[in-house]
C-alpha cells in the first residue's frame, strides 16, 4: 500500500476451525490498515495430504473494500466469483483516514 498498491491479492488455505474464528476479521483488518481492496482466493473442501490423511479447508474466498465492507463471499463451493471494484474508492478511503501517513519504524527516532 505504501508503494501505491490499490489491490492486495491473497492466496489462502485456512482450516475450518481457524477460518470460522478469524477469517473475515483478519481480512477486513488488512483492508482497514492498508485502505486497499483485499481479494482472497481460498481453498475449499477436503484434500488428500501427506501420508493419506485428509485435510479440510475453510473456503470463503472474499472481496473486501478499502472501507472493510465484504463485497463478495464465495462460500464453501468451488467456483468463480466476480466483483466490480472502483480504485477511486481507495483514494477516497485514504483521504478520509490517512493511516499510512502516520506509520513510523520502531526504534530510535
Predicted feature locations:
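Generic alpha-helical secondary structure signal
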Residues: 21, 25, 88-91, 100
Amino acid at each position: 500500500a505504501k508503494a501505491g498498491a490499490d489491490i492486495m491479492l491473497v492466496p489462502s488455505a485456512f482450516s475450518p476451525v481457524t477460518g470460522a474464528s478469524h477469517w473475515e476479521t483478519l481480512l477486513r483488518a488488512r483492508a482497514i490498515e492498508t485502505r486497499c481492496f483485499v481479494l482472497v482466493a481460498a481453498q475449499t473442501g477436503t484434500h488428500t495430504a501427506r501420508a493419506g490423511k485428509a485435510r479440510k479447508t475453510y473456503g470463503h474466498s472474499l472481496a473486501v473494500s478499502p472501507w472493510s465492507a465484504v463485497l463478495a463471499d464465495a462460500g464453501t463451493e468451488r467456483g468463480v466469483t466476480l466483483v466490480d471494484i472502483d480504485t477511486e474508492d481507495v483514494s477516497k478511503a485514504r483521504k478520509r483516514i490517512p493511516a499510512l501517513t502516520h506509520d513510523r519504524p520502531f526504534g530510535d527516532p
